[in-house]
Structure formats: C-alpha cells, structure tokens
Amino acid sequence: MSGHSKWSTIKRKKGANDAKRGKIFTRLIKEITVAARGGGGDPEGNPRLRSAILVAKSENMPKDNITRAIKKGTGEIAGEVYDEILYEGYGPGGVAVLVECMTDNRNRTVADIRHYFAKNNGNLGEAGCVSWMFEKKGLILVDKATITEDELMDQALEAGAEDVVEDETEFQVLTNPTELDAVRGAMEAAGIAFVDASISMLPKNVVDVTDEKVGKNLLRLLESLEDHDDVQNVHSNFDIDEELMEQLAE
C-alpha cells in the first residue's frame, strides 16, 4: 500500500487528539493569517484564504477566531509575523521528506527539524534536494463506501478534476492546484461528500520500505515532525506493505 496514503489516514485518526491539544486550530490560524497577509482579507478574491476558511469551518473553529486571524494577517490588529519555509531531507531508508513550516523564529525551527532527522537516521538537506521528486496537486479524498468509482469519475471530471485514483478505502480525486477550490465546490454542489481536501505534494516515484527497523524510525521521524508546533504539513514518498504498516502504527 502507498505509505503516503496510509500516513494520511493515520494523521487524520490522530487529528482528534491534536484538536484536543489545540494543534489543529493553531495550524489553521497560522494558515489563515499568512493567506490574508499574502492575498488580502477578502476570501472572494483570495483562493488560498477561502480554502483555509472552509477547512477551519469544517473543524468547527469559532467565527471570531477566523475573523481575528484574518485581521492579524491584514495588519488591522497586532499579531505575529510568520515566515513560510520548506525544509527538505532524507529519512531512514532513503525516503524523501518535505516539511512545510510557518515560524516566527527560523533558527529555532531549523535546529529542531535537523535534530529530528538526525535522531531517526535521516539527514536534513539543502533546498531542492528532494522537492523535484514531488508534484503539487489538489487532492480530494472520498470514502469508497459513499459512491461508486464510475459515478465519482463522471462527476469529478465534469467538475474539472484531472483524474480519480482508487486506494484501499478511499478514492483520490486529483486536480490542478489552482482548480482545487472550484472542483471541491462543484463536487459539494453535486452532493458528493469528501473526507479531506487540500493542496498536497504527491511523490512521482516511491521508495519501498520492507525493514521493520527502518519503518519504525521513519514513522517516528514523521510523527516528531507532525507534532512540532511550527510544522504545517509533512510529505514523504515511501511505500510499505499493509501488514507491516499496521504493525508499525500500533
């Protein structure tokens, strides 16, 4: 099974715990703030902000929190200034890892990220060392139990999607990154429910992980990165057997 897909499933399952600790809200507030700073506070004219607000609402973030984050981004009220940084490196087994961060202290963040890589038999690399192995896509996940592949394919392509890929429990609807918001809106209008919708970095090729020790170190690295307050998203290109993945995820 694709480790990228499986890891996404694990992240969503642990998301309930993250929400209790406020991590999801913290990440969403950062995204809204940065989106508003870069493209203005009007979601109608700022697709990134519009997308961030939709995600925040799906996580039941209070409207006041959303409004305050937008105003911080536009400078109407005082707030932290976050830098967006993409860190790249290799995890155990030669797995490529991308780490998207938003931070108010670059030195602190890079020191922590480098430590996580080194601690788990990986190494933080230079800019561009692995990003070429990934392709930016809009990704909409749909539960297979809610719709047939043929029906979804017809609806998704009509909505402007590029392709539909089947996985163990989900369909992955792929879009041009700039078309994600439009495709998602068209699918919603057609009554298609989805599990998640986001801009993602999809691997062009995958690295097979068959060794249990390598797998443990890899998951520990990914979990450490995901749990860091400055990390927004983590992408990797590993592929792993379903049985081994289940053992490691326990």
UniProtKB/Swiss-Prot annotation:
Superkingdom field: Bacteria
One GO location term (cellular component): cytosol
Gene3D superfamilies (UniProt xref): 1.10.10.200, 3.30.70.980
GO molecular function, one term: DNA binding
An annotated GO BP: regulation of DNA-templated transcription
Family: Belongs to the TACO1 family.
Protein name as it appears in the record: Probable transcriptional regulatory protein DP2908
Species in which this protein is naturally found: Desulfotalea psychrophila (strain LSv54 / DSM 12343)
